[in-house]
Every structure is written in structure tokens, then in C-alpha cells.
């Protein structure tokens, strides 16, 4: 479902993600998603969820969570297990079907909405936590979405993002080049090698196509990453205290432990609270 008020870029991104996250992609999602694939990143996420939930629970007996871009439920489940009430939103029917199965034990505290993110913000609704896990990099204008999310938070509400690529031109050189090398080492074995190479060379010239699904699904991954500093600046100006957690993640199993040991940082999480 695509909002009539979207720009061409936003329409392209929503349509690309809706088409990409089909049943086939859902079945292999864990194999290509580092935050789901690796126990170390699942543990990191679990620790952050514990922190976010503990703060929310101080101010609400049953904290309410709006999970934007909820996907197949890996990020949703820990909040339900902690005792929160969750509204899970996504554009992919296949992903939400998997979420429904994964989180079925908590149906009494789970509401699922098959809408795009813009349709998730309903008049009169407020939440103790807005969660966006592996989501911001899919959205062309993620700053506006976060601004809208901040407006529906309760007085002691929190914004919590996880698993988005650090803006590439803010990375130190060793991290930047290590990140590029390990990505292309993994990508070379994923099929359509020459098509991928052609798209990479085109993007290096600053050329992106509105009708190319590969340019729009992982929107900011194939551009310059997500600007973590701009997000913190915007939220701080609205009275939030922000904590940024930087860490390493990659699809390639051989490189994940190496990057972590070397202290490479290419991915971030933000917890912002009033």
C-alpha cells in the first residue's frame, strides 16, 4: 500500500521493498541478515532491549512498542517476551506471516498491521517505545520518519534503532576499506556478479535509477549509509538524551569474528530517551 503523498523516490523504495520481501526472501532472511544470523549480534540486541524495556517499565506497567518495519519478528519477539504490548508494522505480507508464527504465543499483546510506515502513525496513538530494527536504510527520508515517531512518543518515551550502516564518509579509513572488501568478497558469490558490478560502477558515478529495484530496496546501503550524527543532532534538539552504539556486522561468516576482534565499526544503534 503506497501513500499518494509520496515522492517518486519514496514510492520506488516502498514498492521495491514490498516486492523484494516476498516468501522466497523471507525463507532465507536469517542467512543474509547479520543481526539475525550471528549469536553475538543477537546477544547485543538482547542487552539493548533489556535496557530499553527496563526504562520503559519504570514509567508504564505494560510498555507499548510500535515496531516499524517489523519484518519477520526477530526484533519484535524479545519485547513481547519482556512483557510489552507491541504493534508490528510492515509492508510485506510474507514477513508478517512469519512474525505471526514466531510471536504467536503472545497474541494477546500483539497487533499486526500490513501498512507502510507512513500509515502506521494514527491520530491519538502514543507509545513508550518506537523501534526500527534494520529499517532506516530502506527509507529515503528517514529523518522525517524519525521526527514523526518522536511526536507519538509518551513523555518518557524512547526511540530505538538497530542495525543500520554508519554513514560511510564518517568511518575511519581502515574501517571503510575493511567494510568494502568484506562486502564485495561476500557479494561475489551471491549470483548476478556482472550485473552487480555494472550497478556498482554506475553508482560510483552518482547515477541511481528510480525504477531499479536494486537501487531502492537497500536504499542507503548502496548510497552513503545512514547519517547517525544527523539523527542524534535532530533528536537532541527535541530534548532527547542519545546513546549511539557502534559495532561490526557483515553477511560473510568468515569475516564477522575477524571484524569484531579488530574493532571495526560499520553499523550503529541509537537509543534516545527523554
Predicted feature residues:
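Core SAM-dependent methyltransferase catalytic element
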Residues: 238, 255-274
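Class I SAM-dependent methyltransferase SAM/SAH-binding core
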Residues: 72-119
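A conserved beta-strand element that flanks and buttresses the S-adenosyl-L-methionine
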Residues: 131
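Conserved class I S-adenosyl-L-methionine
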Residues: 1-71, 78, 160-199
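Short alpha-helix
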Residues: 222-239, 245
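A short glycine-rich, Lys/Arg-flanked "PGG" loop and its adjoining helix->strand segment in the class I
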Residues: 143-155
